[in-house]
């Protein structure tokens, strides 16, 4: 099944909850972002938000670098950080404690709380869920080369969106590696990971890893650098003596981690 809003996002971590609740599929929110921000901005208390221009609202405890460029129709929430030379073109709702880094460009987006797009990212016509992170240089491509409307698909399922501009939908805790390209209409499930330099089309299922040539499920016992979605177990603890015994055996037998016997010994300890 194609991912719905409820499959990707915990709506307690965004001011756009009311808007997203009205949408079954996440891409349906994109044409509604601008009017929603304008209406929401008028309700924000002046005791908490600065109002430097008619359509821009910035939380008083947010940090916006003097070299950042802000367009129109923008809300920057509490604790967010917009770093030097960031370019927020417009229609952007930036959540609490989010990070928008140097030379990052945003356009028609919702960033949930704690999202990080910290270095040289382009995020357009997209929604990034709670604690989603994009590595340096990772981008969302939001227009097809033939300029035709974008189709969202997962396996054999397809949905015509009617949108000529549609970037990516990142579920909560999605992790995108450096230099990755998320092609128009890409959907990254909750807790999913995309390796660096990978070009993603279609949908990456929740709690899976897109390695480029293959998509695999995350293993129990794996770790994540940042807080995770679902059940992620702590790494298996292996007695130091057991590891030392394996290494001594490698020396005696001339094997090692690249040798079939060596790999078997590592697997017996629950390691690779």
Outline where the language-model segments fall.
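Glycine-rich active-site/cofactor-binding loop and its immediate structural neighborhood
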Residues: 60-103
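Terminal amphipathic alpha-helical/low-complexity segments used for targeting or macromolecular assembly
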Residues: 1-55, 191, 197, 206-208, ...
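Glycine-rich hexapeptide-repeat left-handed beta-helix
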Residues: 17-18, 111-113, 118-235, 244
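Hydrophobic, well-structured mid-protein blocks that either form specific transmembrane helices
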Residues: 94-114, 118
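Pentapeptide-repeat beta-helix register
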Residues: 73-74, 80, 91, 104, ...
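ABC ATPase A-loop
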Residues: 57, 75, 93, 169, ...
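Short gly/ser/thr-rich secondary-structure transition/capping motifs
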Residues: 44-48, 61, 157-159
């Amino acid at each position: 099944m194609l991912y719905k809003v409820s499959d990707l996002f915990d709506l307690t971590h965004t001011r756009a909850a009311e808007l997203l609740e009205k949408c079954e599929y996440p891409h349906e929110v994109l044409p509604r972002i601008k009017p929603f921000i304008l209406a929401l901005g008028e309700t924000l208390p002046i005791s908490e938000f600065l109002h430097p221009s008619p359509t821009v609202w910035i939380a008083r405890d947010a940090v916006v670098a003097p070299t950042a460029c802000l367009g129109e129709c923008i809300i920057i929430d509490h604790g967010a950080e917009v770093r030097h030379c960031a370019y927020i073109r417009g229609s952007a709702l930036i959540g609490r404690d989010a990070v928008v880094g140097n030379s990052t460009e945003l356009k028609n987006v919702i960033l949930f709380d704690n999202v990080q797009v910290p270095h040289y990212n382009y995020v357009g016509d997209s929604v990034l869920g709670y604690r989603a992170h994009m590595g340096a240089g990772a981008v969302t491509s939001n227009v097809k080369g033939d300029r035709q409307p974008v189709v969202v698909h997962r396996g054999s399922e397809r949905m015509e969106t009617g949108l000529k501009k549609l970037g990516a939908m990142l579920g909560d805790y999605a992790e995108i590696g450096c230099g990755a390209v998320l092609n128009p209409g890409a959907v990254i499930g909750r807790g999913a990971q995309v390796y660096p330099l990978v070009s993603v089309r279609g949908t990456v299922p929740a709690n899976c890893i897109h390695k480029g040539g293959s998509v695999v499920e995350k293993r129990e016992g794996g770790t994540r650098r940042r807080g995770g979605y679902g059940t992620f177990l702590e790494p298996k603890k292996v007695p130091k003596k057991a590891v030392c015994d394996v290494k001594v055996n490698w020396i005696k037998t001339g094997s090692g981690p690249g040798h079939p016997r060596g790999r078997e010994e590592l697997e017996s300890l629950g390691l690779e």
